Every structure is written in C-alpha cells, then in structure tokens.
Amino acid sequence: MNFTESMNVVHARIQQLEPENAAKIFGYLLLMQENGNRDMIRLAFCPDSVMCSVINCVKYELARNSHHYHSPPSDHIPTPKFGSFTGSSPLSVSVSPPMKTGFWENSTEMDTLQNNLQFLNFEDPLTSPEFSNGFFSQERQCLPLRTSRRSPSLPEFPVKICHYFNKGFCKHGNNCRYFHGQIIPERESFAQMFNPNNNLSDEEHVVSPVSLEKLEGEIIELLKLRRGAPISIASLPMMYYEKYGRTLQAEGYLTESQRHGKAGYSLTKLLARLKNTIRLVDRPHGQHSVILAEDASKFVEYTGERNEHGAILAGSRQIYLTFPAESSFTEHDVSIYFTSYGHVEDVRIPCQQKRMYGFVTFASSETVKHILAKGNPHFICNARVLVKPYREKSRSSRYLDNYKPLHGMRYGSKFIERDIEMNTLPPRVSESSRMRKPFLSEPEQSVSKSLPTNYSYLGFSSDDFKLTSNAEQEEQAERLSYLLDYLNTEDNVMNITTNYRDNDRRTHCESLDSQVLNLPESPFSSLSGKEISTVT
C-alpha cells in the first residue's frame, strides 16, 4: 500500500466516524506527523477503537489551540490533555476523576474503553477506584453509537492474515509481518506507532550482545549433536524449535522468509556475525548451510563451478580431459605431457573408436590446482585438449547404474533367426503379442503344462528355446505367451500327433513346407468307409 492509498483509507474512516469535522482532523494529522507515509499506513490498518481515540485527541487539541471547539460540559468525561501531537514526542496524557458517580451500562463498552486508554498510555487514574466507579455512557464517551458496539479487532480495511497462525502455529510469533488477530500489539504504544525514530525495522538496528551470545551457544550445542554435519539455514529454525521448544529469536533479526518487503537482519547476516565458532557454507542454488568452524575443513566445498554432474571434490587429485575424436595420442603421451606439472600416477582413456574424454590422476592435489589455474587449452600431439575439474558422480547416475536392465542373455542361433521372423508379423499380431501381460492366463497355463519336456517345432529342438543363463520365470512366461500367440494365428497351424503306445502322448510338428494334416493311427481305421455290422 502506497501513501496515496493509505490517505484515502484514513480519510474514508474519519469521514465515517466523524463526518462533521473529517476535513480538519485529517488535515491536522497530515500537518503534525513528521513521518507521514509510515504513520498513514499504520492508521489505515488500526482498529476502529484506536481510530476513535485518535479522533478525540485531535478534536481536543484543535479546540484548545484555535478555540473553535468548546470544552465538553463538566458532567462529561474530560478529554485527555497532552502537548503537541508530534511523532517525535511521546504522549503525556492524564485523566482527572469525574465528578459524578454512576454505573457502567455495558461491560463490553468498559473493556473497549480500557483497551483504548491503555493503547494511548493513560496513566494511574485508570486503575484508581474513583475512575473505575465513574459514570460513563455511550453518548458521553464522545464515540458514535455504532462504533461502541463494533468489535475492535475488526479493522475497516482488510489486512493480510497469517496463514500459519490460522492453522494453529506460526514460528515467527509477534515478529510475523502478517496479522495474527491481536487487538493491540503488546509491546507497542501510541508513541511507538507514530515515532519516526522507531528503529525496529531499520537495517542498522543493533542486536543485543547478550542475546547474540546466548544464541551462539545454543546453535553450537545443536551443531555438536550433528557430529560435524552441516545444517541448512532453511531447516535451522525448525530444528532449533524441536530442541529448545521456542522459536529461533534474536532481537532485531528477521528470517529469510520475512525479508521480502521489510528491512532487517536476515538469519544469514545474523549467523555471519558468529565468525569465531560458526561458519557459513555456500550451497548450490543459492542456499546456505551453517557448520562448526572446526568441522568446516572436512566439508565438501561448493564454491567452484557447479553443474548437474555433481560437486567439485575438495582436494581431488584427478582431472577430466576432453579432446576431439580424431586425436591420435596415447595414454603414454598424456602422461609425458602432464609430468612437467607433477608426478602422474594414472592415465585412463577409454578404448573406443571415437574416444573423446579421459582422466588423469596425480600424486598431489596441488598439481591439480596448478593445472586448473593455468587454464585451457592444452596441446598434446597437436591435438587440442581441455582440462576440467573432476566431479563427484551424482546420485541419480548411481541409481540408474544399479537398476540397468539385464544384458548378455543369449539364445540359440536358430531361435534368434525365428525371433526376427516373428517381429515381421502383421501389426495386428505383433501389437497383441507385445501388449500381453507377463503372466499367463489359466487356459494357457494348462496348455503349457501339457507340453512334453522334449519336443520339436518347425525343425528346431527344444534346446534351441532354452536360455543359456538362468532367466527369471517372468521372462520364460513372456516368451511362451508370445509363442502361443504366434501359433494361434490364422496363417500357422500347429500339427499335433498323438500316439497311445505305452500310454505316452507325444506331439510332432511338421515343417512349414508340409501343410498336410496327418491323422494318427487308430484301431478303428479298418472300419472307416465300411458298414459296421452288429452281432446279435
């Protein structure tokens, strides 16, 4: 909200509460406040009860200075008396005891007025017995009838309510920049609200040394429990709360989530002041971590160049080489070239037709730093070579390496040729085969169980269909399902020959050239085509 919007909101609220003198009251506020921008914004968001109290104070000040407003009768509550209404001087307000005694017409009105007087720093007469027994009515409070019955916690202009406070807990507490539903801040007064010298949100605000020392000791204790492991600044407040049962708090600091739109010490700046025992470590993507100073040397540094392949290892003795594929130098040539920088322990270049990278390991990490500091390019046997720092292998690549599909499964040569022919089937057949689940249905399982252990199909023995390695049952079931789909096509017929000799049933398949259906020998074959005579 800018200054113009805040002025419009304040003027509208004054016009609603005091329509007769709205222009004079609003003009007085503009003239007498030194820091008008901030004061107007605070007035725009203050409760109605506070706005009514401010209006009454301004009315009395205008009446006293210009004599255009007359003092209220003696049976009314005397209006608070104070000096000039400026932001730099705190309010000095006193209320004299009333002359008449009476009763409170409504306890809610009493609480509302007491809150208003406390907010304006009214002094001892508020707590005196004479003041508490005074006679007040809605008309004698100088407040409109509609405002006295209105909840003071409902501001006229909507404010941003804290989402986490509504859910039950906000770790920022009273320092949260959003509205927590409180009527009046506990540590604020009317003088603090309109004081231009208020430095709570100033960047130069000094953090208390006692608070800083206490916070440092608590963070050190928290880091020692981690045994040298760093803690990210994003998770530090929550870990601090779980450990000590309170929010991470130091006078004058704001967390990183609170910095947007509001000045103040960020948590990063606050921890940077603890240089003797705590170190801040840069992390990828702009994050920061905090670690004990004694453990900082053991931590992997992320200050160098970063990419998706991983982080640069601190103290690494390897370098990464890239070069054109047409280069012809050998590992021995690379070793001779880099020996001029330091002792070379190992050179690795993959044995590929188009090799384009390699690794060199040195005896000392200082040699690596010297080579990287020299820069690129390097020339080995007239080939341009680029040197890059060795990076740690990322977790994602390790995960993929552990879950690579099984390779090296060899099948019989004849079956491989037949498998190629199967892949040339019509789309209707091939799609139905590939879309089948790896598990067989019950009819297919019954057929597969009825097949003998040794059988021949299309001139191939059953050994050609066996895997040379121990394949999983799912692979076997999928192969058998694929085979059954192929056999059930209209262009292929499976010929089964059944023989009842020795009560054994055997299946014989003819080759693709012979499409003749051979019926098995039957003991009733002699009766075929003849009449069967019955013997009586």
Swiss-Prot record:
Q: Residue ranges of the HTH OST-type domain?
A: 211-294
Chain intervals annotated as zinc finger (C3H1-type):
156-183
Q: Which InterPro entries match?
A: AtC3H46-like_PABC-like, AtC3H46-like_RRM, Nucleotide-bd_a/b_plait_sf, OST-HTH/LOTUS_dom, RBD_domain_sf, RRM_dom, Znf_CCCH, Znf_CCCH_sf
What SMART domains does the record tag this protein with?
A: RRM (SM00360)
Which molecular-function annotation in GO is an example for this chain? nuclease activity
* Top-level enzyme category: hydrolase
Could you tell me the superkingdom of the organism this chain comes from?
Eukaryota
Keyword Plastid included in the entry's annotation: no
Keywords, A to Z?
Answer: DNA-binding, Hydrolase, Metal-binding, Nuclease, RNA-binding, Zinc, Zinc-finger
Gene3D superfamilies registered for this protein in UniProt: 3.30.70.330, Zinc finger, CCCH-type
Q: Where's the RRM domain? A: 317-392
**Enzyme Commission no:** 3.1.-.-
Is the DNA-binding keyword given for this protein? yes
- Outline what the protein does: Possesses ribonuclease activity in vitro.
* Record protein name field: Zinc finger CCCH domain-containing protein 18
What is the organism of origin for this protein?
Answer: Arabidopsis thaliana
